[in-house]
């Protein structure tokens, strides 16, 4: 009898949580000094979070969509840590809740093109923070629209020149160091 109850409990828990998601850890923005104003950063974060939510729904929360979501949410939250869409999506995904499809201003082709254009502008501004965000945007753009030749070319040139983008520092902020008194 107790084995049956345990089975029912496990089955009920599985129904509530339809997928596992490892949320990005963002303690503070690494893009504070990036060459964008706060309104732009918030708009990019919102559109990225909406696109990500819609992709998760479209792809039924498969591993590819959840992997993309981890990177996209990390970028969105670094751009605008209090962005409503990004915070809500992160919460829902952590709980295993399928997000709602949302109306978006940008389809995949347009969003990827926007990211490539912004990345080119950020590269021209120079500085490590601008270049890091540019690399992130190119990486996301090539995932969003792998047929975008400008995104693919920029992505491949980045790999040749700099190697693969290390997402760890972006998706997994280190624990804060607490000094000894």
Task: Describe the role of every protein-language-model region.
Residues 45-46, 92-117, 157-181:
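Alpha-helical linker/edge segments of TPR/alpha-solenoid repeat scaffolds
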Residues 41-75, 114-129:
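Alpha-helical segment of the N-proximal tetratricopeptide repeat
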Residues 1-16:
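Bacterial Sec-dependent N-terminal signal peptides
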Residues 14-60:
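N-terminal leader/linker segments that initiate helical-solenoid repeat arrays
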């Amino acid at each position: 009898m107790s084995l049956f109850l345990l089975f029912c409990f496990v089955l009920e828990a599985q129904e509530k949580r339809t997928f596992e998601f490892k949320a990005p850890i963002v303690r503070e923005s690494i893009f504070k000094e990036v060459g964008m104003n706060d309104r732009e950063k918030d708009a990019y974060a919102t559109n990225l979070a909406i696109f990500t939510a819609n992709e998760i729904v479209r792809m039924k929360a498969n591993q590819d969509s959840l992997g993309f979501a981890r990177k996209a949410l990390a970028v969105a939250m670094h751009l605008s840590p209090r962005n409503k869409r990004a915070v809500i999506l992160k919460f829902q995904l952590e709980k295993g809740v399928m997000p709602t499809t949302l109306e978006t201003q940008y389809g995949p082709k347009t969003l990827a093109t926007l990211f490539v254009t912004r990345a080119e502008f950020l590269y021209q501004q120079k500085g490590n923070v601008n270049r890091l965000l540019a690399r992130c945007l190119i990486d996301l753009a090539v995932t969003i629209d792998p047929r975008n030749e400008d995104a693919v070319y920029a992505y491949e040139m980045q790999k040749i020149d700099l190697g693969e983008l290390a997402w760890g520092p972006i998706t997994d902020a280190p624990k804060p160091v607490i000094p000894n008194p």
